[in-house]
C-alpha cells in the first residue's frame, strides 16, 4: 500500500525544527506531553478564525513560551491586547503553577501555508461549496504566490456520494522523498451533513541548504 510518511516528521533535524523545544526526564515527560497537547488543542479551538498555522512550545523551569504562527494576529491580540490577556488567563487554568508567555508571529503568505490552505478548503466544504472548485481555487492562489508545487487531497463522502472516495489535484512538483526539499504539510477536517471529509495539502516551497551545496561544488572544483 502506498502510505505516505508525515513530511514534517521525516525532515525534523534535517531542515525542519521541532515544534516542542524542551527536555524532561522520564518522570515529567508524559505530563509535559499531555500538557502540550491540551495547550495546542485549546489555542486552535479558541483562535480558529484567526488562522493558526502552528504552535511552538518552549519550556524552562517554571515558564512556558508559546510562539503562535497566525495569518490574522490582530484577532488573537485583540483591542489593546485584551484578547491575548484573556487567552493567557484561560491557558493558566490548564497549566498549573507555571508562567505563560505568548509571542504572536504573523504568517506573511497564508495562501502558501499548507495548514491554512487545508483549513480554508475544509471551511468551504462546510459551506457546501463543490470540493473540486475549492481545491482548484486554493491551488491557483498558491501557485500565484510563488510556490514550486502543490498537491491537495479530499477523502470522504464527496458531494454526498454513498461510497467514500479520495480525489487528488496537483500542480507543479512535489518531491516527497527529497529531504532537502522544503515540503509544508497540512491536514484539516470538514464536518458536513454526510459525515467528515478529510483534507490534506502538500506545498513545495523550494530546496533548502543551497549554501552547503555551493561549498561542495567549490571543493570539487579545487580538488
UniProtKB/Swiss-Prot annotation:
Signal sequence annotation: none
Record has GTP-binding as a keyword: no
SMART domains: KH
Assembly with partners or alone: Part of the 30S ribosomal subunit. Forms a tight complex with proteins S10 and S14.
Family per record: Belongs to the universal ribosomal protein uS3 family.
Name of the coding gene: rpsC
One GO MF term: structural constituent of ribosome
CC terms in the record's Gene Ontology section: cytosolic small ribosomal subunit
Span of domain KH type-2: 39-108
One Pfam family recorded for the sequence: KH_2
Keyword list, A-Z: Ribonucleoprotein, Ribosomal protein, RNA-binding, rRNA-binding
InterPro entries from the UniProt entry: KH_dom, KH_dom-like_a/b, KH_dom_type_2, KH_sf_prok-type, Ribosomal_S3_C_sf, Ribosomal_uS3_bac-typ, Ribosomal_uS3_C, Ribosomal_uS3_CS
NCBIfam families named among the record's database cross-references: rpsC_bact
Role summary: Binds the lower part of the 30S subunit head. Binds mRNA in the 70S ribosome, positioning it for translation.
Keyword RNA-binding assigned: yes
Name of this protein: Small ribosomal subunit protein uS3
Organism listed in the record: Clostridium botulinum (strain Loch Maree / Type A3)
One GO-annotated biological process of the protein: translation
